[in-house]
């Protein structure tokens, strides 16, 4: 068996960083060797740095407890023994943009869960099941950065994961106007009910920045690589998306209710067929975290439900249900995705697996 690729986590003490830690335990391709966080955590063991703030459902893995946390600002020290890093740092966006480029320029690929570089034109915003061809833009990005190995790749916002896969499956029917309302779990804010008690029995009808991301990010996901410009050009067809994003008292799982018009006139049978028979390069390549079936279609009127369906395909699959004709729009449906697995650390990990399979992430 070939030697595993060594990986570090930037922002290892936050909720997404903790999720990366749990996902990387016994990973078949990657070995977690470095943890980095703020100066406040640097120099402590990971267990000391976390203190009582471990937020995962499973206990902290033994292999990380005594790892000494490095200062994320000490770039040269952090990259010493790693082949690439996951970024889940909690900083102002301008600082994230700067530090992620600093890491990339050390010839260390950065796979980021952050939004800071999502609209950098030559940074791919990948969903392995939908747009793996976007990773081709990395060669253009490397020229800009002056690197031969280093680059930045990002994943899209957690809010779009519950409906964008359906739009991708229905691409041939030309989605036009889409109205989406998302009902988003508190873990998306890095919280649990223990540290956000006011969310118990409550709904907050505003999540800063989420509506813009929910409307615009699918357009980059559905865009194309312009080889002349060396960048990703967002989809410029007739697709328009408007959204409302609401925080609800659920721990994990973002639900979306969606109304949609098409340029063509698909039947329900055609729509369901495209969902359940959706295939992708991710499953063909056998990526460790790629779901066997990306999208499941549920026929019961009361599905998808968070309690029953959020962990579909280990939290990496997407559940669609309640597909029916609408009196104003053409069709409507409900989608569900796990926001910290498919929508955050799990999606970033699968992206790294795709980048490794395509030869962009290698041992240094």
Residue ranges, per PLM feature:
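Charged docking surfaces used in two-component/phosphorelay signaling
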Residues: 187-364
